[in-house]
From Swiss-Prot:
Domain TRAM span(s) in chain numbering: 196-254
Gene that this polypeptide is encoded by: rlmE
Protein name (Swiss-Prot/TrEMBL): Ribosomal RNA large subunit methyltransferase E
A Gene Ontology molecular function term of the record: rRNA (uridine-2'-O-)-methyltransferase activity
Compartments where found: Cytoplasm
Top-level class of the enzyme under EC nomenclature: transferase
InterPro entries: NA-bd_OB-fold (IPR012340), RNA_methyltr_RlmE (IPR050082), RNA_MeTrfase_FtsJ_dom (IPR002877), rRNA-MeTfrase_E (IPR015507), SAM-dependent_MTases_sf (IPR029063), TRAM_dom (IPR002792)
């Protein structure tokens, strides 16, 4: 506490009426990455004591919802749910609160109770942030944004890849308000993907036409995939390289027989 009293952001939070110095982290994240826009609906997971809720309400002016295992003291214009984000009952309450279309932004500044054993604490942080990501996938609108605090360590890169599998743009960012000795970092995912496929998925497809850029264009579950360096009439095994909100790019892994030799012309099948 003595260290906090000497802390610039601690004093600023007191002066400006914020419940936590962490409020300034969200302000700085938003100044840099513009994750919350005016009118956005925002859900904050692990929201107690409510510092991020206060800032989210100021930035958005729209629907703001806080979720935590603990009770959150009332904030004007903010709704709260006391519940576990891993529970289906909590997910249903969130969706009822924000609407069936989902939230524009999901935030999570939560951290596990620290034990002092760094390996254990890092693992608990990854477990918590994975729960936040899974919750976000259930409640975000297409093209929505996600911000989550993560403790750095040997599992961080794997977690970052999970976020990249679900968002078009992903950054790791450390706001100035984070203490210099802290291992925390914020992962920011923008434009949530609702495509029926993900990076690394493999399919066998027939190339029936080329797009305007000269790449092969195929439909997989109604989703357009552009395939590089193919010709009309080829049957190829592809691997998804990048996914955007409305289309994806794929590379050829193997060239198979000509499409006209296949009885399933124009079809695609998931490759194991």
């Amino acid at each position: 506490m003595a260290r906090d009293r000497r802390d610039y952001y601690y004093h600023q939070a007191k002066e400006e009426g914020y419940r936590s110095r962490a409020s300034f982290k969200l302000k700085q994240i938003n100044e840099k990455h513009n994750v919350i826009k005016r009118g956005d609906s925002v859900v904050d997971l692990g929201a107690a004591p409510g510092g991020w809720l206060q800032v989210a309400k100021q930035l958005s002016g729209g629907k703001v919802l806080g979720v935590d295992l603990q009770r959150i003291a009332p904030i004007e214009g903010v709704e709260t749910i006391q519940g576990d984000i891993n529970a289906d009952s909590t997910i249903k309450k969130i969706i009822r609160a924000v609407g069936e279309k989902g939230a524009d932004v999901v935030l999570c500044d939560a951290a596990p109770n620290l034990s002092g054993n760094w390996s254990y604490d890092h693992a608990r942080s990854i477990e918590l942030t994975t729960s936040a990501l899974e919750c976000a996938k259930k409640i975000l609108k297409p093209k929505g944004n996600f911000v989550v605090k993560v403790f750095q360590g040997d599992m961080f890169n794997d977690y970052l890849e999970k976020v990249r599998d679900n968002f078009v743009h992903v950054k790791a960012y450390s706001p100035q308000a984070s203490r210099s000795q802290s291992a925390e970092i914020y992962v920011i995912g923008k434009k949530f993907l609702t495509a029926p496929l993900r990076r690394g998925d493999k399919f066998v497809v027939d190339i029936e036409k080329l797009g305007s850029g000269g790449d092969g264009a195929v439909l997989i579950e109604g989703f357009v995939v552009f395939v590089k360096e193919v010709e009309v009439g080829e049957k190829v095994r592809i691997k998804i390289a990048d996914v955007k909100p409305n289309f994806a790019f794929a590379d050829v892994e193997e060239r198979l027989e000509k499409a006209e030799d296949s009885e399933n012309l124009g079809n695609s099948e998931k490759a194991e």
